[in-house]
């Protein structure tokens, strides 16, 4: 026993219950970097799932010369990103020769002639597709590592998918027990876990009273997908802002419209012509979200992360600089 317990057990790859998957064998983001790391690139690979992990590994293997097929349950790649980011990534992957199959249920996996056959069904039309590959990589999301905690023996509440439920101070439903990182929900980013650890440490050891407590907020949590092209984003997508009831304004600027883009040989209309998209509240001039896709996107969006965390409006910031 202890007066304070902090749970940070992380998460595992979510392995879907697909008939034949266990018998055929598969890779995950964990096992790939262990005993199953290939001595040479696979000739062909099917990636099941197209969130950040799926599209990142799809890019890595494609760059190594593997014939890659990405099979996605959703109608979009990286569906939690802004829709225009997803569409731009799809166009670029297909232009590179990556086979992307969207809106699919994986119904069966079998072995045939030394290969693995992934059988999928279109969720709208019911059309069956068979994809023969040398290897399969499962990238179907993250599940919390809670099995060995035996939470059923405690009063700790969990969410429908098994994540540990916490309040704004990262405390569970049991006083004195906290949870941080992948175990308390998505998004599964290391910097989110670091941020939550800072909050818990401050509140437990440095706050003099409850008025000094810090609380977790994720509306300006930045994230990057290291696909090709990269995607960097912070805040609300355009669709999320509209759904939230804001008077939404959108601004876009393409790489081809800048000196840097011109120097890189990017022309208007090129499939690799990335862009910056800013979503604002027209009533207050506050930035609600910023999204960028293209070379060095992970660097380009950082000033907007700082600006959104500062709370100032773009017009105010510009005037102060002047």
Predicted segments — roles?
Residues 226-322:
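Flexible, glycine-rich terminal cap/loop adjacent to redox cofactors
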Residues 2-10, 47-48, 68, 131-141, ...:
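Short hydrophobic core segments
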Residues 123, 159, 167-168, 238, ...:
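Short, acidic, Ser/Thr-enriched surface-loop or helix-capping motifs
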Residues 34, 42-46, 52-127, 187-194, ...:
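Rossmann-like dinucleotide-binding cores of NAD(P)H-dependent redox enzymes
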Residues 112, 148, 155-157, 264-273:
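Short loop/turn motifs at secondary-structure junctions and domain boundaries
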Residues 1-25, 29, 43-44:
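Glycine/serine-rich phosphate-binding loop and adjoining beta1-alpha1 elements at the start
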Residues 22-41, 130-210, 305:
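FAD-site-proximal beta/loop scaffold in flavoenzymes
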Residues 9, 28-30, 102-104, 160, ...:
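Short loop/edge segments at beta-strand edges and connector loops
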